[in-house]
Curated annotation (Swiss-Prot):
Pathway: Siderophore biosynthesis. This is Probable acyltransferase SID5. Its EC number is 2.3.1.-. It comes from the Eukaryota. InterPro entries: Acyl_CoA_acyltransferase. Keywords: Acyltransferase, Transferase. GO terms for molecular function: acyltransferase activity. It is an enzyme of class 2 (transferase). Probable acyltransferase; part of the gene cluster that mediates the biosynthesis of hydroxamate-containing siderophores that play a critical role in virulence via intracellular iron acquisition during macrophage infection.
């Protein structure tokens, strides 16, 4: 699943809209929307979630999704943000993403695990930023 949110004109692009998952119903919809709200609170991202379960793995689908997002970010000259698993962090840093000091907190009631946990959040600046880092 991949969820893209491109906001390069602020509120004019619907930045204040509520994330929803209209294709689900009942408890599944409620749980998914809670998860999206946790991600949404971190800020403006281009790529919120990318995964390639099962057969598509190791066929380059994830790389194609990342390349598309980086191309959009470069054309608009905006940073590209994404969350990661700890395992995926190596992949993103090899692509030039910088890990931010604050991650996305995922609530236990959303994932039904024992406690809240934090996912790393990364950013890749556009070429117009000229080696400027996000946090310093």
């Amino acid at each position: 699943m991949t969820v893209w949110e491109v906001h390069w004109r602020g509120e004019a692009d619907g930045w204040q809209k509520n994330p929803t998952v209209a294709w689900l119903q009942g408890p599944e919809k409620e749980g998914a929307e809670k998860a999206f709200w946790a991600i949404w609170e971190v800020g403006d991202k281009l790529l919120n979630h990318r995964s390639a379960p099962g057969a598509p793995k190791k066929r380059g689908i994830g790389q194609l999704l990342i390349d598309w997002g980086l191309d959009v970010g470069e054309k608009l000259q905006v940073p590209v943000y994404l969350e990661s698993t700890r395992a995926g962090l190596v992949f993103y840093t090899k692509l030039g993403f910088e890990k931010l000091s604050q991650g996305a907190v995922v609530k236990a009631e959303v994932t039904h695990v024992a406690s809240d946990f934090e996912l790393p959040v990364t950013v890749k600046m556009p070429s117009a930023a000229r080696r400027m880092g996000f946090e310093g």
